[in-house]
């Protein structure tokens, strides 16, 4: 069928093809295989049934939005993106310094009022306003337009008084979002597939219409998602770690002194594992096979790739119901396996019982449930907060977790970005009280965390937000994958076990990277023989 054409407010239109519902990976489309930077995949699955909920693939982008402190840079990636810069220049907030330089629009936001009360600070002008302005410019009466991207852990220092880390080098922006040019959106619950092209520069119509037709033809002709298997017999043995077990255990002991002194009740230190990764996409596919999780994501930003399979949502907001939700995870045990590495059901159940009866784990989890309730109290209507699925156990490839779900109705004057600002960073990656815990983490961890512990997901012009915490993930730069993992520390934590927990959490990703490297080596050897 021919593409339907929908108007987009003031800045062009979109072309849309409704396709037969298929469970297809973007790799089946040549534009994904051939594309370079500025593309993203975000998959959501049901925790219990493992059934897919939604898959969004930004196949190509026209505008890239980066935030570094008070500076937001909107960079046009082609003529289609350039057509957006003029209306965005006109929509620049009055208190913001705006500079247009060719394909780049630079907005500098004023310093936040540090002495304002909490409600005024929440409503104050911040760099997050740039995302609202972009979505407002793209607003579509015929259906929401979305952005896909990343909030880093270090975005928090724009809103809270955090010390500078010992290592001042920064590699990851406070946030990075992409405005899609070509988008594949699969609603698995409604069994509906849509392929969309957004035309902001009329001169680019023919190019985008042709790309849309090509993708639609490929989509119809491609085979369904192949039943791949994880590479067998792989162990992640050649990784390096920035803190060895003994050093990490000593760090845990120093942080326990702060717990003892009453500075914090809980804190979540982390360490970084690294190993070579020549093919991030292949490593991502291996991770999904080995560690099927509710959120799976792949972001190619050009200067780095980020991929992961995360068990934990960051913040979800449904604009229609106005429900905002957090999903704290705290309390971990390894999966029960026999000598061959297969799941031993009896041992697995014993480990679950041990987890459910562990007073330290229960106390740690309830502390973070209370923190989530307190975070939502800042932005929700009074009397609407509730805790669901209290102390449920979710199982993943290498570990099992205690989880709960905390929800409430967002205050009528606030939106999803207000809610995210109030709740960042998620307590399960920080500790409690949150600000003091973040300050101590800056003091004891060497550098910026970057993507780890932040959030990745989609935000649309209707106001919806769906994000995953960036954990069980790898940030790949210059052929090296860095996998960060943390552990919740309380007064009676065993430092040795906390070091072991970080390793267990990192192993799913490290093993996937090792499997991808072996797969690549075997493929190269086969081609050499051929």
From Swiss-Prot:
Changing residue 114 to P: In strain: PAC174. GO terms for biological process: L-tryptophan biosynthetic process; phenazine biosynthetic process. Transmembrane segments: none annotated. It is an enzyme of class 4 (lyase). InterPro entries: ADC_synthase (IPR005801), Anth_synth_I-like (IPR019999), Anth_synth_I_N (IPR006805), Anth_synth_I_TrpE (IPR005257), Chorismate_C (IPR015890). Mg(2+) binds at residues 364, 501. Disruption phenotype: Disruption of phnA alone yields 22-34% pyocyanine. Double trpE-phnA disruption requires anthranilate or L-tryptophan for growth on minimal medium and does not make pyocyanine. Double phnA-phnB deletions are tryptophan prototrophs; they make less PQS. Substrate binds at residues 331-332, 452, 472, 486-488. The keyword Lyase applies. It catalyses: chorismate + L-glutamine = anthranilate + pyruvate + L-glutamate + H(+). Its EC number is 4.1.3.27. Pfam families: Anth_synt_I_N, Chorismate_bind. Keywords: Lyase, Magnesium, Metal-binding, Virulence. Pathway: Secondary metabolite biosynthesis; pyocyanine biosynthesis. Its cofactor is Mg(2+). Binds 1 Mg(2+) ion per subunit. GO terms for molecular function: anthranilate synthase activity; metal ion binding. Belongs to the anthranilate synthase component I family. PhnAB is not feedback inhibited by tryptophan. Part of a heterotetrameric complex that catalyzes the two-step biosynthesis of anthranilate, a precursor for Pseudomonas quinolone signal (2-heptyl-3-hydroxy-4-quinolone; PQS) production which is required to induce the genes for the biosynthesis of the virulence factor pyocyanine (PCN), a characteristic blue-green phenazine pigment produced by P.aeruginosa. Heterotetramer consisting of two non-identical subunits: a beta subunit (PhnB) and a large alpha subunit (PhnA). This is Anthranilate synthase component 1, pyocyanine specific. It comes from Pseudomonas aeruginosa (strain ATCC 15692 / DSM 22644 / CIP 104116 / JCM 14847 / LMG 12228 / 1C / PRS 101 / PAO1).
């Amino acid at each position: 069928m021919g593409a339907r054409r929908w108007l987009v407010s003031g800045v062009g239109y979109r072309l849309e093809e409704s396709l037969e519902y298929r469970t297809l990976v973007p790799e089946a489309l040549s534009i994904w295989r051939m594309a370079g930077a500025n593309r993203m995949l975000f998959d959501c699955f049901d925790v219990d049934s493992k059934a897919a909920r939604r898959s969004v693939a930004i196949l190509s982008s026209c505008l890239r939005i980066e935030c570094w402190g008070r500076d937001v840079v909107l960079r046009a990636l082609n003529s289609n993106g350039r057509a957006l810069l003029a209306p965005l220049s006109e929509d620049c907030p009055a208190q913001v310094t705006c500079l247009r330089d060719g394909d780049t629009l630079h907005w500098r936001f004023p310093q936040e009022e540090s002495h304002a009360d909490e409600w005024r600070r929440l409503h104050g002008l911040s760099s997050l306003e740039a995302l609202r302005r972009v979505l407002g410019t793209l607003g579509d009466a015929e259906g929401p337009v979305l952005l896909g991207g990343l909030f880093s852990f270090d975005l928090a220092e724009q809103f809270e008084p955090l010390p500078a880390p010992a290592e001042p080098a920064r590699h990851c922006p406070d946030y990075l979002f992409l405005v899609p040019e070509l988008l594949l959106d699969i609603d698995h619950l409604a069994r509906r597939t849509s392929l969309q092209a957004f035309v902001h520069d009329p001169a680019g119509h023919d190019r985008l219409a042709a790309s849309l037709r090509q993708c639609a033809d490929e989509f119809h002709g491609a085979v369904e998602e192949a039943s791949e298997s994880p590479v067998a017999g792989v162990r992640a043995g050649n990784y390096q770690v920035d803190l060895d077990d003994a050093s990490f255990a000593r760090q845990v002991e120093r942080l326990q002194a702060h717990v003892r002194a009453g500075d914090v009740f809980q804190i979540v230190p982390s360490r970084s594992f690294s190993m070579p990764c020549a093919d991030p996409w292949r490593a991502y596919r291996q991770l999904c096979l080995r560690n099927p999780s509710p959120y799976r994501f792949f972001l190619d930003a050009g200067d780095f790739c980020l991929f992961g399979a995360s068990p934990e949502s960051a913040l979800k907001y449904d604009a229609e119901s106005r429900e905002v939700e957090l999903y704290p995870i705290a309390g971990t045990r390894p999966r029960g396996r026999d000598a061959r590495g297969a799941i031993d059901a009896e041992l697995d159940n014993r480990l679950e019982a041990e987890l459910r009866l562990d007073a330290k784990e229960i106390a740690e989890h309830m502390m973070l449930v209370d923190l989530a309730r307190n975070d939502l109290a800042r932005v929700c209507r009074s009397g609407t907060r509730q805790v669901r699925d209290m102390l449920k156990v979710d199982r993943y490839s290498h570990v099992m977790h205690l989880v709960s779900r905390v929800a409430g109705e967002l205050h009528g004057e606030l939106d999803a970005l207000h809610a995210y600002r109030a709740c960042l960073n998620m307590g399960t990656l920080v500790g409690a009280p949150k600000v003091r815990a973040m300050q101590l983490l800056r003091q004891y961890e060497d550098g910026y965390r970057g993507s780890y512990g932040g959030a990745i997901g989609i935000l649309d012009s209707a106001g919806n937000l769906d994000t995953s915490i960036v954990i069980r993930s790898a940030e790949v730069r210059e052929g090296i994958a860095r996998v960060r993992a943390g552990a919740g520390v309380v007064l009676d934590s065993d430092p040795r076990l906390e070091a072991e927990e970080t390793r267990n959490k990192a192993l799913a990703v490290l093993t996937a990277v090792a499997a991808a490297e072996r797969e690549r080596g075997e493929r190269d050897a086969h081609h050499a023989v051929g």
